[in-house]
Amino acid sequence: MILIAVISLGAIGAVGAVFLYAASKKFEVYEDPRIAQVQEVLPGANCGGCGYPGCAGFAGACVKADSLDGLLCPVGGGPVMAKVATILGKEAGTAEPMVAVVRCNGTCQARPRTNSYDGTKSCAIASTLYGGETNCSFGCLGYGDCVNACAFDAIHINPATGIAEVDEEKCTSCGACVKACPKNIIELRKKGPKSRRIYVSCVNKDKGAAARKACANACIGCGKCAKECPFEAITVTNNVAYIDYTKCRLCRKCVAVCPTGACLLYTSPSPRD
């Protein structure tokens, strides 16, 4: 009886093994071995700055793509993309390097505090309760949700201005700070030649007089910048100007005519102590 039981169990196990083997072959998902090779040369930050869900997703996209144009690992940059191109036997793609930009210049001097917030130091929480400690309900709250979201120590709150500042040497344009900001004042913009760019450092949609009363550096929607721009790179919508970085040629005419200094020529972040 024992022998029969052993033989029966062995037969059942053998049949089960055959079925499992057949199923594994039938439902096997093939993965191109080059994906693992590409993933090995990537930094492994899994920041999502490339637009894909982690380094594995980006590696898969590189392998499947006919061309590497438009594909860029923001952490590794050109050197890493050159390695990827070598592995895949493709030409290294071209992609404009991006950087996070804080579109607020409401410093402590330009945007005086009118009240004091003693709640949890979180921009997300504070923004659900009220507009902030100043008369501008659009600007940087300065509680550092973007700082906490950044995995690269690339953004900090300047204690002198109360505004978030980006260290572009560390910024990988992963977009974590953009998602963390409840005021939507942080955006990814083209780094520009020699890390120079012009942007409107304000998102206040109030009418000119109200915006100027809340902050001395506010955009008042006067439209002088748009009229002066020879490249049609500037539009004024909802009382605030916006510069299309794909059209801007850094002629600086908008900077010269802006009455409040909202149009900024950005060169490099202020050094931190």
Locate predicted features.
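Membrane-cytosol interface motif
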Residues: 34-46
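Conserved small/polar residues in nucleotide/adenosyl-binding loops
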Residues: 266-273
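Transmembrane alpha-helical segments of multi-pass membrane transport proteins and ion-pumping complexes
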Residues: 13-21, 180
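Fe-S ferredoxin-like electron-transfer domains
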Residues: 71-148, 152-164, 191-209
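Feature marks short, highly hydrophobic, charge-poor N-terminal signal-anchor/signal peptide-like helices
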Residues: 1-8
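Aromatic-capped interface at the extracytoplasmic side
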Residues: 21-32
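Iron-sulfur (Fe-S) cluster-binding segments and ferredoxin-like electron-carrier domains
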Residues: 38-41, 52-88, 264
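Iron-sulfur cluster-binding cysteine motifs and their immediate structural context
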Residues: 53-58, 115, 124, 135, ...
